[in-house]
């Protein structure tokens, strides 16, 4: 992988990630394909929304279908017929989400399978081996996602263990002679000094990119912004910066303003299946009866397949009848909305008009533009 940085405005960055399987323009949003599929979508449909890269889930793909079946197909690209870049998370967040059915030790994590209750052990070495079998273009280190709330001492112990796991991930990745890219994950909770210690330790080990983890786990939005403002300018400028698991459209806008290059989140797809649709004027709840006889498209500014061909009334009808097509059309629209947002942000950085773009983004939804500190490096 090669990262090219074209231009900046304030801390916002316009660039690209170049892989053998294709180029990803940044800032970029990655749709989530947990089980090797973006729910309800074919790879061709996902690509048509403008997505250049997908996120796959190491933990779930390890449990089903497993490494053996994956290797029989070649890798995840061949298994799901997506021949563009794929980033896989390490499984750390999913283990974190298991709560009481897992036990974390220095060696790794013991837990029971959420599928059949089988006892399973996952450690940094195994995570690297699974991601190697997936053929991931970007491999994430195995870490512990520091929960919120956590005391500073709890966050320190968690972060320092993640650093030790980062070294083990690096060592196993190198032992496997994996030709792809490995990203480190910055932890430390809401504590700036711990974030600094984490980043410095990761830079000493050496990675191809750096993710900010342990955010969007329940902390106030102000804390997320504060941590991003603190840590992003300290990440080596020639490496991509990835904010994991974020988020709402406004989170992408605010992340880009603070120097983030990559995002992922289940929100556009999950919300689509629940009838919450993103538009240039805000969120539409298609289940609301006021859409029953509305012949207008979801968003007259949107160029997606759904908006070009179907009315709000039709989408309301599909939802009321619980038709699968409704969830699919909603997903196409929400994914395209996210990609159009990223296209707009990239264009605004290129032309030096990011402030105007951000103002239009908020005012078109009847919202005030949030105040931010002067963000310059």
UniProtKB/Swiss-Prot annotation:
Residues at the catalytic site: 89, 264
Domain of life (superkingdom): Bacteria
RNA binding: annotated span: 245-251, 269-273
Cofactor, free-text remark: Binds 1 zinc ion per subunit.
Pathway it works in: tRNA modification; tRNA-queuosine biosynthesis
Binding annotation for substrate: 89-93, 143, 187, 214
SUPFAM superfamilies per record: tRNA-guanine transglycosylase (SSF51713)
Keywords of this entry: Glycosyltransferase, Metal-binding, Queuosine biosynthesis, Transferase, tRNA processing, Zinc
Pfam families with a match to the protein in the record: TGT (PF01702)
GO annotation terms (biological process): queuosine biosynthetic process; tRNA wobble guanine modification; tRNA-guanine transglycosylation
Gene Ontology molecular function: metal ion binding; tRNA-guanosine(34) queuine transglycosylase activity
InterPro entries cross-referenced by the UniProt entry: ArchSynthase1/Queuine_TRR, TGT, TGT-like_sf, tRNA_ribo_trans-like
One GO CC term on file: cytosol
Keyword Metal-binding assigned: yes
EC code: 2.4.2.29
Reaction(s) this enzyme catalyzes, per UniProt: 7-aminomethyl-7-carbaguanine + guanosine(34) in tRNA = 7-aminomethyl-7-carbaguanosine(34) in tRNA + guanine
Gene3D superfamilies referenced in this protein's UniProt entry, alphabetically: Queuine tRNA-ribosyltransferase-like
Cofactor(s) annotated in UniProt: Zn(2+)
Binding site for Zn(2+): 302, 304, 307, 333
Protein's UniProt keywords contain Transferase: yes
Family recorded in the similarity comment: Belongs to the queuine tRNA-ribosyltransferase family.
Function of the protein: Catalyzes the base-exchange of a guanine (G) residue with the queuine precursor 7-aminomethyl-7-deazaguanine (PreQ1) at position 34 (anticodon wobble position) in tRNAs with GU(N) anticodons (tRNA-Asp, -Asn, -His and -Tyr). Catalysis occurs through a double-displacement mechanism. The nucleophile active site attacks the C1' of nucleotide 34 to detach the guanine base from the RNA, forming a covalent enzyme-RNA intermediate. The proton acceptor active site deprotonates the incoming PreQ1, allowing a nucleophilic attack on the C1' of the ribose to form the product.
Subunit and interaction comment: Homodimer. Within each dimer, one monomer is responsible for RNA recognition and catalysis, while the other monomer binds to the replacement base PreQ1.
Protein name as annotated: Queuine tRNA-ribosyltransferase
Taxonomy of the source species: Bacteria, Pseudomonadati, Pseudomonadota, Gammaproteobacteria, Alteromonadales
